[in-house]
Every structure is written in structure tokens, then in C-alpha cells.
């Protein structure tokens, strides 16, 4: 018999995004070992990518399924298990900040990019030289550096330069 028992990350009525599917058929006779598993880190990466591409609701649907699995009733909401406790791949959820706000910083050009998919927002930002919050409110960017320095010469908001 099978002596190797893999962990189960979703079961029963749990929703989740499978690592691999064959919607048009053609499943291999020996598919790769993890193909039918659900990993939050992959789900968050796919969700943030969908958000970046403008498919915000599809991305949020994936996140809702993750959070329902880890809502504290059955699973620890602070320990999204993958390959052991406190596995780092779930930190891909950080990508949703960029996916929803479109915020990214170019330290060479000293440009802060904003391309919000959610309207006004206030979000955490971290660079190699500092961290704080970035806000888009009433058509204006506001950077509040809490520690260090984030040298911004211009803002690029949805493709338009704002000095």
C-alpha cells in the first residue's frame, strides 16, 4: 500500500484553485505529484495577477475561497499550511497590494507608479530605503514615509505624469 500520506490543504466542500487541471481532457496517466492540490501561495499569486490584469472580482473570488478555508473554525487563519507550518509561499498575498493599487516604485527614475483598480485607497509601501503608506485620495497621491527615505521626483498615475 501507499505509505506516503500527503497533507490535505482542502477537503470536503472547501473551495480552492487546483494546481493543474485538464479542462479539455488529456490528463496524463501519471500526472505530476501535486497536480490535484490547493496551495494558498499559488492562489494568491494567481489572484494578484488577475487583479493586475483588471480582473479584480475574479481575483477576489479566489482570495475569498482561501480566507473561508482559513477562517479560524477548522484551520488557523495565521498559518496557511503548505509543506509544513508557516510556509512562506502564502506571503505571495503581498502581491495583492500591487494588484489592487497598481503601486510600484522605480528607484532609478525615482518614480512612484499608481494604477488603482479600486478607486481611492491607502496602502502600505516598502522599498529598500524606507517604508510607510501611499494614498490615492480625491485625485492626489500622498506618500507618508514612516522610516528611512523614499525619494520620489514624480508620480505616474495611470500612465500620466504628475509632478
Question: Model features per residue range: what roles?
Answer:
Residues 2-108, 118, 151:
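Active-site core of glycosidic bond-cleaving carbohydrate-active enzymes
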Residues 53-58, 118-163:
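Beta-rich accessory regions
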Residues 93, 111, 140:
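A residue-level signal for beta-strand positions that form part of recognition/binding surfaces
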Residues 113-115:
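Domain-scale activation on soluble regions of proteins
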Amino acid at each position: 500500500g501507499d505509505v506516503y500520506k500527503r497533507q490535505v490543504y482542502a477537503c470536503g466542500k472547501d473551495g480552492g484553485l487546483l494546481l493543474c487541471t485538464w479542462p479539455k481532457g488529456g490528463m496524463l496517466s501519471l500526472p505530476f505529484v501535486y497536480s490535484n492540490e490547493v496551495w494558498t501561495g499559488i492562489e494568491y499569486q494567481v489572484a494578484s495577477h488577475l487583479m493586475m490584469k483588471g480582473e479584480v472580482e475574479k481575483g477576489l473570488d479566489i482570495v475569498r475561497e482561501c480566507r473561508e478555508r482559513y477562517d479560524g473554525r477548522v484551520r488557523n487563519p495565521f498559518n496557511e499550511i503548505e509543506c509544513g507550518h508557516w510556509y512562506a509561499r502564502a506571503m505571495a498575498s503581498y502581491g495583492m497590494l500591487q494588484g489592487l493599487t497598481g503601486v510600484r516604485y522605480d528607484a532609478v527614475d525615482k518614480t512612484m507608479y499608481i494604477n488603482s483598480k479600486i478607486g481611492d485607497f491607502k496602502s502600505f509601501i516598502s522599498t529598500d530605503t524606507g517604508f510607510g503608506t501611499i494614498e490615492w485620495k480625491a485625485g492626489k497621491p500622498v506618500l507618508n514615509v514612516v522610516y528611512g527615505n523614499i525619494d520620489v521626483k514624480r508620480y505616474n498615475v495611470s500612465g500620466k505624469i504628475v509632478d
